[in-house]
A protein has these predicted regions:
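Ubiquitin-like/PB1-type beta-grasp interaction modules and other compact soluble beta-rich domains
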Residues: 1-82
Length: 83
């Protein structure tokens, strides 16, 4: 099982954690799953609205192809810009 931590804007329940099974093998699979649960998520993600970390490591390059495995913790959080 993979644990996915979600920001408030993506929660479909009061819980901030989603558990997904073997059907999710990559961040691309996770994006597909979340887009079915939260319509418009894919568009927001593709426009740079969110960042992804897997096991506390920020995924910067090749996000869609990044593999996830049982026991991983994936965090999706809003992208923040500033200077």
């Amino acid at each position: 099982m993979i644990t996915v931590r979600l920001p408030v804007s993506l929660r479909t329940t009061a819980d901030d954690v989603l558990h997904v099974g073997d059907e999710v093998r990559s961040i691309a699979d996770l994006i597909d799953l979340l887009d079915r649960q939260v319509p418009g998520f894919r568009d927001q993600f593709e426009q740079g609205g969110f960042n992804v970390a897997v096991n506390d490591e920020l995924v910067i390059h090749g996000v869609h192809d990044h593999e996830v495995h049982p026991g991983d913790v994936v965090e999706i959080f809003p992208a923040i810009a500033g200077g």
